[in-house]
Curated annotation (Swiss-Prot):
The keyword Nucleotide-binding applies. Residues 547-573, 939-951 have a biased composition (Polar residues). It is found in: Cytoplasm; Preautophagosomal structure membrane. The lineage of its organism: Eukaryota, Fungi, Dikarya, Ascomycota, Pezizomycotina. This is Serine/threonine-protein kinase ATG1. Gene3D superfamilies: Transferase(Phosphotransferase) domain 1. Its main location: cytoplasm. The gene is ATG1. Residues 359-368, 432-442 have a biased composition (Basic and acidic residues). Homodimer. Forms a ternary complex with ATG13 and ATG17. Its EC number is 2.7.11.1.
Amino acid sequence: MASKTPSSSSSRRPRNVGVGSFTINEEIGKGSFATVYRGTHVPSGSLVAIKSVNLGRLNKKLKDNLYVEIEILKSLHHPHIVALMDCRESTSHIHLMMEYCELGDLSYFIKKRDKLADNPSLFDMIRKYPMPVDGGLNQVVVRHFFKQLSSAMEFLRDRDFVHRDVKPQNLLLIPSPDWMAKSKNGPEAMKASKESIVPMVGINSLPMLKLADFGFARSLPSTSLAETLCGSPLYMAPEILRYEKYDARADLWSIGTVLYEMMTGKPPFRAANHVELLRKIEQNEDEIRFPSKTVFSRDLKDIARRFLKKRPEDRITFPEYFAHPVVTGPIPGLVGEDLPKEIITPSRSPEASVARHPSLRERQRENPTPKPVETTYESLIARDIGEQAPRSPHIEANQPVEIPGHKSGRPGSRDRPSAISAATAPNVDTLPRQRDRTERHYAPIGRPVSRKPSYDEQANLPVQEEIRSSDSITEAEQDVRDAREYVLVEKKAVEVNAFADEMAASPRLAHANHIPKQPTRRHTSMGAPNSTSGAVAVPPSRAVQKAQGNTRPDTSSARNSYGSYGKTGSSPSTASAIAKALQGASVRVFGVSWSPTLIGKGPSPQQLYNPYPAYPTPNTGFIGDARPIDEDQRVVNVIEDSATRSDVVYGFAEVKYRQLIPLAPSMNHGLGGPNNEKVGDAMDEDDGLTVEAIVNLSEEALVLYVKSLSLLSKSMDIAGAWWLRKNRGGVISGGHTPGSDSSSAVQAGNRINGAVQWVRTRFNEVLEKAELVRLKLVEAQKRLPEDHPGHPSNHATASKIVGGSSTTDGVVLSSGITAEKLMYDRALEMSRTAAINELANEDLPGCEISYTTAIRMLEAVLENDEELIPRKRSPSLREDKEKCDGGEVNGINFGDRKDVLKVLQMIRTRLHVLKKKMAVIARHQSMPPPSSPRHSHSGGTTPTIANTPPH
């Protein structure tokens, strides 16, 4: 059923169209195939929800689903299932008159939990059970809604129904029975029966939950299997995502995702598409962790984890589910008048229909179950933080005990974290998750101790202290995992900065800086000749530099070999040339170019961004001993490779960014000084761009920034793992190793530290720009016509997260906008242009830069986020094929990887040929010109052979 929100915020376009005895009024919700209106029953004036489906938009399968929904709703009569009042069909529409749920859906309820007190029907609930500042709903409210959802699911299960689309958007809410009994303001909602507003379970003073939208439901006995892909991806069971046959246990997964979202405020897994979502689920290895700031009792966490098992046979069974203490037991923590009115009688009777058993409900209300032993708010808090005082022998026997080393939330040795599909910018996503082993290593680095929960008041309980310590570790690990999710990128920034600060402040590295360096030279490490450090110094703040137009000190001369770009950074001239190559195609596509100073012309070009790396590289001019590369040096190479690729992707994103947000007038001028543009014109960000162009540019810039962030994150994770290993081994200072090995370790430590500082600065900068682009995208989407697919009103409900503070909140991207596709197309275009220029012998150095940049882009496309230390890239396409035969990598299937590898190999070949040609030209130009014979003239007489004296 279409998601419905309170009319104050979503009502529009009054209709006032008559359908039978009902009148269609304003729109209150919109789904994929139907629009929901507020309607009025004319004889009684009662409110109904009218789901209007345009038959012309439905194919045969969707029509069949609609008729199935109608038949199912006609046969279901349960207080926690939305009732069907009437159904009318015309030549063009089918109108379903259903119960009106004025509080909207559970998704809206969770999202707006901080504003619920503004609704008069919810004021008392918030007063008694305030919502947590961080996380989801109050534990009492979570248990209340979960009981009512379980009652509806049990009713369906007894009739062999599988819903197949359980999600917060399909869980609708009405005011509590107590509030409706005493409130007489305004028209009432039409009731299917008197029992339809009397809850089977839960608390009378809290809102009542009703399950809706049976468009995908079907009768499926426990022995049958279905194989139709349906439902909402974020809440789909893994077996459905794998296109496997499934049974009723698929609903158990969806219930677990809803419970997790009620507890934490977010789904357990988020991704841009179902392929990436499935990979995240599978790589999570059934380790469901909860954020550190969410406080819930053990039994609630237990049942959530038992729902969220990737294999259906590992999940909790339906009998176990319906008999679980969370479902059958009392709700702890009730206050005030809720204590004696708690309704806890389960609805497990196969014939628990309200219409068939009204007397049972009356007996339940007349003889409430005695209140539990522990009913005070203080006892609830004690249970929340680990003191599980037994309420009754039955409940205590069913309470799981979590002990260190045996927690379902602890990472296992086989964990492989999900990585963001660099191909697709997430609707709600994503920075990449890295390997769990890195998470375990990297979590403690630089994290302030004060961030962990403290339970000093119970330090005298050794057993509880041990449990709490285990919980803290699990929660810290979850923080790191969440930080690598794109929607929680701010936490990742905290981790990146903390780790960089720790390395910068390390006395061991400070001591290592005073040890003389072993003369060595890698063929790929060439710094600027006039720079003692071999690279450019880091400015105090690149953000200030860009805002004020400050120039950086000029450093001349590009490195000797552009081919070394993959291992180290570039000089300013190299970076400018790369930027020039990157923006070349944009001139043709968008008609927008940069001023000369932005493409490297002039003695002191103003840098768009800090070229990589801005830290000391090994001194040039020394020759090494050509020994095999050691492990430390390999780590250095991998970190610098990943950082360099991120720099290329960042440069591509900057092309889009500068078209969206032009430079200030102080920076936007050429060698002749400020141009004659008016300041107002220069600051008009949307000058010359249509709204659709702004949306497209914003989406492209955002996905490229996300890709750059993923590569930066990988560099930091590799450095974090290396740092932890060195801290354990204590070999950075090299005091107990041979001289050359000691010097190598020292140099590796210095270079990794420099790389970490560069990554930290770049990460913060990219994060800030990604947020600016996100805001611009959201604003531009609102300016689109209402009938445009990109307008917020036409976004799918499951992907629509508006008003959040994270980098991707409120972002819905157009289909097909992926980082890989953009990078692949740009690499092809750059290489083709370079090939044309090469054949014409024009701008050969520029051709070399274009080839190199294209190679780095394609390498970034193929980057495997699942390998901290990747295997060496094979020059053979056949060997690369064997390496990626295992399936998809970062959402790219083998066929696509094969195509990219072929293009990559061709460009490498062209680069190799170009370098040979340039070397031949250089040798030819360095040769002295041949000396021409000089002729002597004496008195005008020309010497002849006859005049030559004989020998």
